[in-house]
């Protein structure tokens, strides 16, 4: 019997005699026979794989660079919140490539590094500075998920009989899809552009999916007239040069 409570047995694997006992138990004479009985014959690749001769790391690097020259570089016009960005080398070297962010470990929580915690805190502070919010979390999965969570927060904050959520017509389609998925089981109705008295919250995309900048003052005042909370789906980079959502009230 293998002693599974010991490190060696758990992590190094079975010995040859152990393999023999296991094969005997399932009536197989070898591992090859086990594979033949397990994997359907029509998908087993019996020929030898054709590999190129081995090469040194330096030669492989040069060869990869030469292959990359055959790529066709095209401009992307996808939009919809996905924009090319440039990371300055000083940030790349001192932040993304700095091992100090991911090697200093926290004694009380060994699975999370102190550097990562500090980076998340800096991220949250940056979001607070750019948006004008009092607090900020450490990010969600993506913008669509964040919009859905914001809708749910507005729904719970209002604690009323309102079940309508208004979305700006030029919202990113991927965001709208997630909103609809989250709203349906809760009985929340999604409407576009024009909130009514049954609206508890309204999502405004700024800049919108076409890159246009909205007049938030007018939109927020309309929402207030219906006692609806305003949620701004903002491009963080744009807030460097634009008013923060808080400045619009």
Regions found by a protein language model. Give the residues of each.
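N-terminal entrance/gating region of PLP-dependent enzymes' catalytic architecture
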Residues: 14, 37-122, 128
